[in-house]
Amino acid sequence: MHVVILGSAAGGGVPQWNCRCSICSLAWAGDSRVRPRTQSSIAVSPDGERWLLLNASPDIRQQIQANPQMHPREGLRHSPIHAVLLTNGDVDHVAGLLTLREGQPFTLYATPGILASVSDNRVFDVMAADVVKRQTIALNETFEPVPGLSVTLFSVPGKVPLWLEDASMEIGAETETTVGTMIEAGGKRLAYIPGCARVTEDLKARIAGADALLFDGTVLEDDDMIRAGVGTKTGWRMGHIQMNGETGSIASLADIEIGRRVFVHINNTNPVLIEDSYERASVEARGWTVAHDGLTLDL
Protein backbone atom coordinates (compact mmCIF):
# COMPACT_ATOMS: atom_id res chain seq x y z
CA MET A 1 0.00 0.00 0.00
CA HIS A 2 1.32 3.43 -0.98
CA VAL A 3 0.31 6.48 1.06
CA VAL A 4 0.99 10.14 0.27
CA ILE A 5 0.13 12.90 2.70
CA LEU A 6 -0.90 15.61 0.28
CA GLY A 7 -1.85 18.14 2.95
CA SER A 8 -0.87 17.92 6.61
CA ALA A 9 -2.41 21.07 8.08
CA ALA A 10 -5.84 21.81 9.49
CA GLY A 11 -8.23 24.34 7.96
CA GLY A 12 -6.48 27.36 6.51
CA GLY A 13 -3.08 25.69 6.18
CA VAL A 14 0.24 27.07 7.43
CA PRO A 15 0.64 29.98 7.30
CA GLN A 16 -2.99 31.00 7.35
CA TRP A 17 -3.69 33.78 4.89
CA ASN A 18 -4.20 36.52 7.51
CA CYS A 19 -2.34 35.15 10.54
CA ARG A 20 0.74 36.54 12.25
CA CYS A 21 0.84 34.24 15.27
CA SER A 22 4.36 33.23 16.30
CA ILE A 23 4.28 30.11 14.12
CA CYS A 24 2.76 31.70 11.03
CA SER A 25 5.19 34.63 11.36
CA LEU A 26 8.08 32.19 11.07
CA ALA A 27 6.48 30.64 8.00
CA TRP A 28 5.87 34.06 6.38
CA ALA A 29 9.53 34.91 7.01
CA GLY A 30 10.69 31.74 5.26
CA ASP A 31 12.20 30.31 8.44
CA SER A 32 13.23 26.73 7.67
CA ARG A 33 11.98 25.54 11.06
CA VAL A 34 8.33 25.90 9.97
CA ARG A 35 7.45 24.23 6.69
CA PRO A 36 4.47 25.66 4.81
CA ARG A 37 1.63 23.15 4.84
CA THR A 38 -1.54 22.78 2.81
CA GLN A 39 -4.91 21.64 4.08
CA SER A 40 -5.86 18.12 5.11
CA SER A 41 -5.83 15.38 2.46
CA ILE A 42 -4.13 12.06 1.74
CA ALA A 43 -4.00 9.67 -1.20
CA VAL A 44 -3.73 5.87 -1.01
CA SER A 45 -3.01 3.33 -3.75
CA PRO A 46 -2.49 -0.44 -3.89
CA ASP A 47 -0.23 -0.21 -6.93
CA GLY A 48 0.98 3.38 -7.41
CA GLU A 49 -1.26 3.75 -10.46
CA ARG A 50 -4.84 4.02 -9.19
CA TRP A 51 -5.41 6.31 -6.24
CA LEU A 52 -8.08 6.93 -3.63
CA LEU A 53 -8.22 10.55 -2.45
CA LEU A 54 -9.33 10.93 1.15
CA ASN A 55 -10.82 14.39 1.61
CA ALA A 56 -10.74 17.07 -1.08
CA SER A 57 -8.76 19.99 0.27
CA PRO A 58 -9.25 23.54 -1.04
CA ASP A 59 -5.56 23.21 -1.98
CA ILE A 60 -6.06 20.08 -4.10
CA ARG A 61 -4.78 21.57 -7.38
CA GLN A 62 -1.57 22.68 -5.65
CA GLN A 63 -1.27 19.27 -4.00
CA ILE A 64 -1.69 17.44 -7.30
CA GLN A 65 0.95 19.64 -8.89
CA ALA A 66 3.39 19.00 -6.03
CA ASN A 67 3.09 15.20 -6.24
CA PRO A 68 3.95 13.60 -9.61
CA GLN A 69 1.99 10.47 -8.66
CA MET A 70 -1.16 12.58 -9.04
CA HIS A 71 -0.36 14.10 -12.46
CA PRO A 72 -2.40 13.38 -15.62
CA ARG A 73 -0.52 10.79 -17.66
CA GLU A 74 -2.31 10.08 -20.92
CA GLY A 75 -4.65 11.57 -23.52
CA LEU A 76 -6.11 15.07 -23.31
CA ARG A 77 -7.81 14.48 -19.96
CA HIS A 78 -6.78 11.93 -17.37
CA SER A 79 -6.30 11.52 -13.64
CA PRO A 80 -4.90 8.66 -11.56
CA ILE A 81 -7.48 9.65 -8.91
CA HIS A 82 -10.19 7.03 -9.34
CA ALA A 83 -12.27 7.79 -6.25
CA VAL A 84 -12.73 10.36 -3.48
CA LEU A 85 -13.78 9.55 0.10
CA LEU A 86 -14.93 12.13 2.66
CA THR A 87 -14.44 11.64 6.40
CA ASN A 88 -16.64 14.63 7.32
CA GLY A 89 -18.22 17.69 5.74
CA ASP A 90 -15.75 20.30 6.97
CA VAL A 91 -14.92 23.05 4.49
CA ASP A 92 -11.26 21.99 4.42
CA HIS A 93 -12.37 18.50 3.35
CA VAL A 94 -15.05 19.27 0.75
CA ALA A 95 -14.20 22.59 -0.91
CA GLY A 96 -11.67 20.91 -3.20
CA LEU A 97 -14.50 19.01 -4.87
CA LEU A 98 -15.20 22.22 -6.79
CA THR A 99 -11.74 21.97 -8.36
CA LEU A 100 -12.42 18.38 -9.45
CA ARG A 101 -15.29 19.44 -11.72
CA GLU A 102 -13.52 19.42 -15.09
CA GLY A 103 -15.28 16.48 -16.70
CA GLN A 104 -13.18 13.76 -15.08
CA PRO A 105 -15.10 10.62 -14.04
CA PHE A 106 -14.66 9.38 -10.49
CA THR A 107 -16.85 8.10 -7.66
CA LEU A 108 -17.47 10.16 -4.53
CA TYR A 109 -17.97 8.02 -1.41
CA ALA A 110 -19.30 9.10 1.99
CA THR A 111 -21.80 8.15 4.65
CA PRO A 112 -25.39 9.25 3.97
CA GLY A 113 -25.06 12.10 6.46
CA ILE A 114 -21.82 13.44 5.03
CA LEU A 115 -22.97 13.06 1.44
CA ALA A 116 -26.20 14.88 2.26
CA SER A 117 -24.21 17.93 3.35
CA VAL A 118 -22.73 18.00 -0.16
CA SER A 119 -25.90 17.13 -2.05
CA ASP A 120 -27.96 19.74 -0.19
CA ASN A 121 -25.60 22.50 -1.37
CA ARG A 122 -26.25 23.21 -5.03
CA VAL A 123 -22.81 24.67 -5.63
CA PHE A 124 -21.57 21.07 -5.78
CA ASP A 125 -23.85 20.40 -8.73
CA VAL A 126 -20.95 21.63 -10.87
CA MET A 127 -19.81 18.01 -10.53
CA ALA A 128 -22.14 16.64 -13.18
CA ALA A 129 -24.13 13.63 -12.00
CA ASP A 130 -23.40 11.74 -15.21
CA VAL A 131 -19.65 12.20 -14.66
CA VAL A 132 -19.17 12.01 -10.88
CA LYS A 133 -21.12 9.18 -9.27
CA ARG A 134 -22.13 9.73 -5.63
CA GLN A 135 -22.18 6.55 -3.56
CA THR A 136 -23.39 6.33 0.04
CA ILE A 137 -21.57 3.92 2.34
CA ALA A 138 -22.97 2.66 5.63
CA LEU A 139 -20.87 2.55 8.77
CA ASN A 140 -18.99 -0.74 9.20
CA GLU A 141 -19.62 -1.69 5.56
CA THR A 142 -16.47 -2.84 3.74
CA PHE A 143 -16.20 -1.66 0.15
CA GLU A 144 -13.55 -1.42 -2.57
CA PRO A 145 -13.32 2.12 -4.01
CA VAL A 146 -10.22 1.17 -5.99
CA PRO A 147 -9.46 -2.42 -7.00
CA GLY A 148 -7.12 -3.84 -4.36
CA LEU A 149 -8.14 -1.43 -1.56
CA SER A 150 -10.67 -2.53 1.05
CA VAL A 151 -12.11 0.31 3.13
CA THR A 152 -14.34 0.33 6.19
CA LEU A 153 -15.83 3.47 7.74
CA PHE A 154 -16.54 3.71 11.46
CA SER A 155 -17.88 6.48 13.67
CA VAL A 156 -15.55 8.44 15.93
CA PRO A 157 -16.42 11.11 18.50
CA GLY A 158 -16.77 14.43 16.73
CA LYS A 159 -19.29 17.07 15.73
CA VAL A 160 -21.07 18.44 12.69
CA PRO A 161 -19.15 20.85 10.42
CA LEU A 162 -18.92 24.47 11.61
CA TRP A 163 -21.21 25.64 8.82
CA LEU A 164 -23.94 23.21 9.94
CA GLU A 165 -23.82 23.96 13.67
CA ASP A 166 -27.03 24.89 15.48
CA ALA A 167 -28.38 24.94 19.01
CA SER A 168 -28.77 21.16 19.04
CA MET A 169 -25.11 20.49 18.26
CA GLU A 170 -23.46 17.85 20.46
CA ILE A 171 -19.67 17.70 20.74
CA GLY A 172 -18.19 14.24 21.10
CA ALA A 173 -21.18 12.39 19.72
CA GLU A 174 -20.51 9.25 17.70
CA THR A 175 -22.57 9.56 14.53
CA GLU A 176 -21.99 9.19 10.81
CA THR A 177 -20.97 12.86 10.42
CA THR A 178 -17.39 12.23 11.60
CA VAL A 179 -15.78 8.95 10.61
CA GLY A 180 -12.50 7.13 10.70
CA THR A 181 -11.33 4.80 7.96
CA MET A 182 -9.58 1.46 8.02
CA ILE A 183 -7.87 0.76 4.71
CA GLU A 184 -6.45 -2.66 3.87
CA ALA A 185 -4.29 -3.85 0.99
CA GLY A 186 -1.77 -6.65 0.63
CA GLY A 187 -2.26 -7.73 4.22
CA LYS A 188 -1.45 -4.25 5.60
CA ARG A 189 -3.81 -1.98 7.53
CA LEU A 190 -3.87 1.82 7.62
CA ALA A 191 -6.12 3.76 10.02
CA TYR A 192 -6.90 7.34 9.00
CA ILE A 193 -8.66 9.56 11.55
CA PRO A 194 -8.08 13.27 10.83
CA GLY A 195 -10.81 14.44 13.20
CA CYS A 196 -11.57 12.98 16.65
CA ALA A 197 -12.84 14.59 19.85
CA ARG A 198 -11.77 11.83 22.28
CA VAL A 199 -10.34 8.32 22.33
CA THR A 200 -12.77 5.60 23.38
CA GLU A 201 -12.17 1.95 24.17
CA ASP A 202 -14.11 1.02 21.04
CA LEU A 203 -11.82 3.19 18.94
CA LYS A 204 -8.72 1.64 20.49
CA ALA A 205 -10.01 -1.86 19.76
CA ARG A 206 -10.81 -0.85 16.19
CA ILE A 207 -7.33 0.42 15.33
CA ALA A 208 -5.19 -1.94 17.45
CA GLY A 209 -2.66 -3.78 15.34
CA ALA A 210 -2.75 -1.34 12.43
CA ASP A 211 0.51 -1.00 10.51
CA ALA A 212 0.12 2.78 10.53
CA LEU A 213 -2.15 5.35 12.14
CA LEU A 214 -2.70 8.85 10.75
CA PHE A 215 -4.43 10.69 13.59
CA ASP A 216 -5.89 14.07 14.48
CA GLY A 217 -3.04 16.38 15.50
CA THR A 218 -4.95 19.66 15.50
CA VAL A 219 -3.85 20.92 18.91
CA LEU A 220 -1.06 20.10 21.36
CA GLU A 221 -2.98 21.54 24.31
CA ASP A 222 -6.70 22.15 24.39
CA ASP A 223 -6.15 25.93 24.58
CA ASP A 224 -3.52 26.31 21.82
CA MET A 225 -5.50 28.99 19.98
CA ILE A 226 -6.19 30.95 23.16
CA ARG A 227 -2.52 30.85 24.17
CA ALA A 228 -1.55 32.07 20.70
CA GLY A 229 -3.92 35.03 21.07
CA VAL A 230 -5.72 34.40 17.79
CA GLY A 231 -8.94 32.71 18.90
CA THR A 232 -11.28 31.81 21.73
CA LYS A 233 -12.16 28.21 20.88
CA THR A 234 -10.63 25.18 22.53
CA GLY A 235 -9.74 22.04 20.66
CA TRP A 236 -12.71 20.29 22.28
CA ARG A 237 -15.08 23.02 21.07
CA MET A 238 -13.83 22.39 17.54
CA GLY A 239 -14.24 18.62 17.93
CA HIS A 240 -10.53 17.82 18.23
CA ILE A 241 -8.65 16.00 20.99
CA GLN A 242 -5.42 17.45 22.37
CA MET A 243 -2.13 15.59 22.00
CA ASN A 244 -0.92 16.16 25.57
CA GLY A 245 -2.44 15.36 28.96
CA GLU A 246 -3.87 12.29 30.66
CA THR A 247 -6.86 12.20 28.30
CA GLY A 248 -4.90 13.38 25.27
CA SER A 249 -4.27 11.21 22.24
CA ILE A 250 -0.65 10.32 23.02
CA ALA A 251 -1.44 8.94 26.48
CA SER A 252 -4.76 7.41 25.44
CA LEU A 253 -3.22 5.44 22.58
CA ALA A 254 0.05 4.52 24.30
CA ASP A 255 -1.07 1.05 25.40
CA ILE A 256 -2.09 -0.36 22.01
CA GLU A 257 0.14 -1.93 19.39
CA ILE A 258 0.40 0.19 16.25
CA GLY A 259 3.18 0.24 13.69
CA ARG A 260 3.77 3.88 12.79
CA ARG A 261 2.01 6.79 14.50
CA VAL A 262 1.67 10.02 12.53
CA PHE A 263 -0.10 13.25 13.41
CA VAL A 264 -2.00 14.94 10.57
CA HIS A 265 -4.51 17.84 10.38
CA ILE A 266 -2.20 20.09 12.42
CA ASN A 267 -3.45 23.57 13.27
CA ASN A 268 -1.31 26.63 12.57
CA THR A 269 -1.13 27.43 16.31
CA ASN A 270 0.28 24.02 17.31
CA PRO A 271 3.92 24.49 18.45
CA VAL A 272 4.95 21.04 17.21
CA LEU A 273 5.14 22.70 13.78
CA ILE A 274 8.43 24.32 14.86
CA GLU A 275 10.98 21.66 14.03
CA ASP A 276 13.57 22.43 16.72
CA SER A 277 11.04 23.12 19.47
CA TYR A 278 10.78 21.35 22.80
CA GLU A 279 7.20 20.46 21.89
CA ARG A 280 8.24 18.73 18.66
CA ALA A 281 10.99 16.79 20.44
CA SER A 282 8.59 15.75 23.19
CA VAL A 283 6.04 14.37 20.73
CA GLU A 284 8.69 12.52 18.74
CA ALA A 285 10.22 11.06 21.91
CA ARG A 286 6.86 9.45 22.62
CA GLY A 287 6.84 7.65 19.27
CA TRP A 288 4.93 10.04 17.01
CA THR A 289 5.84 11.61 13.67
CA VAL A 290 4.60 15.11 12.83
CA ALA A 291 3.47 14.92 9.21
CA HIS A 292 4.55 17.33 6.50
CA ASP A 293 3.21 17.72 3.00
CA GLY A 294 4.64 15.08 0.68
CA LEU A 295 5.41 12.56 3.43
CA THR A 296 5.07 9.05 2.01
CA LEU A 297 4.50 5.69 3.67
CA ASP A 298 4.95 2.35 1.95
CA LEU A 299 3.26 -0.41 3.88
From Swiss-Prot:
Signal peptide as annotated in the record: none
This protein's pathway: Cofactor biosynthesis; pyrroloquinoline quinone biosynthesis
Domain of life per record: Bacteria
Keywords: PQQ biosynthesis, Transport
Gene3D superfamilies per the UniProt record, alphabetical: Ribonuclease Z/Hydroxyacylglutathione hydrolase-like
Entry-linked Pfam families: Lactamase_B_2
GO biological process: pyrroloquinoline quinone biosynthetic process
Recorded family membership: Belongs to the PqqB family.
PANTHER family: COENZYME PQQ SYNTHESIS PROTEIN B, HYDROLASE C777.06C-RELATED-RELATED
Physiological role: May be involved in the transport of PQQ or its precursor to the periplasm.
HAMAP family from the UniProt entry: PQQ_syn_PqqB
Descriptive protein name: Coenzyme PQQ synthesis protein B
Gene name tied to this protein: pqqB
